[in-house]
Amino acid sequence: MLKNKYLIFLIIVLAFSCDFIKKNKKSYFSGKIIKKTNDKISLLKDQVILKESYVSKEGIFYMSLDSIKDGLYNFKHLPEFQYLIIENGDSLVLRLNAVDFDESLVFTGIGSPKNNYLIDIFLNHENEERFIKSLMMKKPSPFRKSIDSLLDLKISKFKKFKKNNKLNYTSIMIMEHAIKLPLYSNIEAYISAKKQNNVIKNINNNFYDYRDEIDFNIQELSNFKPYLDYIILRTNNQSGIDLNSLSNLYLQFNLDRINFVNSSISNPVIKSQILRYIAFEYLLKENILINIDTFLYEFLKISVNKKNNIEIKQLYENISLLQKGNYIPKIELTTVIEENIFINNIYSNKPVIYVFWSYDQNSHQIGLFNKINEFLNTNKKYNFHCININSDVEKWREYLVFIKKNKNIKHFIANDFSIMSKKMVLNNLNKIIITDSKGKIRSISNISSLKSFYLGD
């Protein structure tokens, strides 16, 4: 009897010990980066940096991870990032060329098969974009059949992979969603495109059956871009209003979207992210302030994320300050001779067109200055104040040597891009702000419309 009790006790202890070891064993993330673009690589979980490693001159990095939770992570080697799945005890060795990021990315070591498969999923979706685009011209039934056939092939291939590789529930869930979500997003995009000619009204309800497969409240996917992209597309199609219809319906369209989010998503992280996205998208497109007031009132009744609410309110205030007739916001800049000056103290004897650029975006930079010089060839009544958004003054000055000089062009660099981007509501580098000679805002437009845009004196 005593021996039996001892045996039972020993079994319990061993079971507990094995479970403890399994839960507390280390994981490792290391590798080599060829042509590194940054001195650091970061491992993140849900947008929080868990670990950072210095990347040596030879491109080598190493991280030891204690008792890591199984799930979806991502790593950043700026300016790029990619997802990876880590299970407790994995030892992943990465190799990539930072110039050809995703295409060169390969994993070896414990846990590598699932991550190489995940990267292949992403790359295959990218390679299929042209084919998917060609399907958009089809009628609903043939379109769904084509998408379903492609999905069946992917699922069949994944089943074979699962047979040959041991995967836990979390890894399977992540990979299945990585396979399905882009295709389901394509269906939602198809629905949006067909709304305008009423094709959707005649579609059988079975067309939408894929929607039942996606839960909007999966915490593990709360920062997975394909998952969030799909939900955002779903919100577009929950309104009975056509996105391409009259602009005065745009407010109601977005109110329908946030109400759908409020009724369909209970996970606070996912809910706040989707609401934030919709709010930013709406505020940056809407031109009528009274509509923005209405939207903001309804948004704040739904959104409980204090940080997001403060951010959205600040965006609204900055948009209000950029209205026609107001003076351009007070931003501190640095001149070519490295003098600090506030934007409202820059003298101009002519109306000013403010443009923005980065030396990291070569094609945009070339296109921008080509448009400016083309404009000035026929119209010398305006000055261009070109604001660089980078932080390295010396590197900026080196780039200026290669930019054609013109007495109507002045160059500046932002002292604090974060502050400037918020005050200027700089959501893309194609934005232009037109003021009179004293800094009073006349109009806000896009660089692509510069050629046809009439600027009155």
What is each residue range found by the language model?
Residues 1-28, 444:
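Bacterial Sec-dependent N-terminal signal peptides
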Residues 309-344, 407:
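N-terminal "domain-start" segment that seeds a small globular fold
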Residues 400-433, 437:
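Short, internal strand/loop/helix patches
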